[in-house]
Amino acid sequence: MRVDLNCDLGEAFGNYSFGGDHQIIPLITSANVACGFHAGDENVMNETVKLAKAHNVAVGAHPGLPDLKGFGRRNIDISNEEIYNLMIYQLGALQGFCRIHQVKINHVKPHGALYQMGAKDREIASVIAQAVYDFDPSLVLVGLANSYLISEAKNVGLITASEVFADRRYEDDGQLVSRKESDAVITDTDEALKQVLKMVKENKVISKNNKEVTLQADTICVHGDGEHALLFVSKIREILMKEGIDIQSL
């Protein structure tokens, strides 16, 4: 049994810094690097790619909506053409830094509202998947397990990775509980570990209404901006190794 452990990183910009990227990267297998629209900038992207390479961590693009104020977590009325173009733009930005550091982009995981829009809307998911395929058909598209991001990526011929979350609660239909709700984020370490083991070993998660939901767990996400990110990543890695589960990049 194997699973990838990923984290959204490189989300500082300008004079604003947060997250424990330097402490987290040695513990994960895949880094999703912000590409400048929701967070990150040219200096942070460069440093994050260097850091990932130094620790042999797979580099992935983490493109988001152009919304620094809302950290890319607010829905924006945006056309399919704009979604396609912002995907290509951000992938190109990260590719530049990967090229100078002789690192290949391994995967793509949309961020925040863009991720949720693609998970719930087949047409948007198709646009996202097509952009990734047109940029590089060898890239892995990471998306919410059982969502349109996964099905539409498969339809265009991409390799997919079904993602599960250590620090988020689930609805009965397998979607994530909205961050607008007070119980959306898991902050208790034991609860997070229990959820991770059930998802990885049983391919199931218990929803907020105590319903058992079936899902595939190819990669586990911990949000790098979370208050308990470093602790969660450390404990998840520890318990997976204790259970004999291999932690490998996508």
Swiss-Prot record:
Its EC number is 3.5.2.9. The gene is pxpA. Catalyzes the cleavage of 5-oxoproline to form L-glutamate coupled to the hydrolysis of ATP to ADP and inorganic phosphate. Keywords: ATP-binding, Hydrolase, Nucleotide-binding. Belongs to the LamB/PxpA family. This is 5-oxoprolinase subunit A. Forms a complex composed of PxpA, PxpB and PxpC. It holds the Pfam family LamB_YcsF. It catalyses: 5-oxo-L-proline + ATP + 2 H2O = L-glutamate + ADP + phosphate + H(+). InterPro entries: Glyco_hydro/deAcase_b/a-brl (IPR011330), LamB/YcsF/PxpA-like (IPR005501).
